[in-house]
């Protein structure tokens, strides 16, 4: 708590000070640790006002995660798309695309699902679970869009492994 108070005091005294981004970043980490979603949203929101800051990727991830968990999928989708576009590592890009995929599924946005799943399936290092999830949701989106042949291709790949939930279906 003393660190939190110190950073908060600093921001009250110097809202645009040289270390304000650092303070917002550390306050968002403290908020995450203490499960203070409102605090995390507040401080990551401030960080996102500076898209070129060294904290923007992590801020997008934390911000998007909370919005997703609060079922605010449209807003979370925007964060995940930004993360996908700006990520400096393959791992973070994959987290962004996975977020886009899951938001797309929950928003019933077939085009978003197809694009995200296709992007995920193009990733070099994809876990079998994530590959199956992407194939499954893309197949369902293709069916919704009446692209039966494309859906069948994805479903055939999934059916090879009936040990998984997706393959069994």
Outline where the language-model segments fall.
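Acidic, polar-rich low-complexity tracts and alpha-helical solenoid repeat scaffolds
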Residues: 1-169
């Amino acid at each position: 708590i003393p660190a939190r108070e110190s950073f908060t005091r600093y921001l009250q005294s110097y809202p645009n000070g040289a270390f304000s981004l650092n303070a917002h970043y550390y306050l968002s980490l403290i908020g995450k640790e203490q499960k203070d979603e409102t605090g995390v949203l507040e401080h990551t929101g401030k960080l996102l006002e500076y898209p070129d800051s060294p904290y923007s990727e992590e801020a997008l991830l934390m911000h998007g995660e909370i919005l997703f968990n609060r079922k605010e999928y449209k807003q979370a989708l925007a964060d995940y798309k930004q993360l996908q576009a700006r990520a400096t590592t393959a791992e973070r890009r994959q987290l962004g695309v996975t977020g886009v995929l899951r938001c797309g599924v929950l928003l019933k946005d077939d085009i978003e699902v197809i694009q995200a799943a296709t992007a995920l399936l193009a990733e070099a290092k994809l876990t079998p679970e994530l590959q199956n999830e992407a194939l499954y949701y893309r197949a369902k989106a293709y069916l919704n869009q009446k692209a039966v042949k494309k859906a069948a291709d994805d479903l055939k790949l999934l059916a090879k492994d009936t040990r998984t939930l997706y393959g069994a279906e």
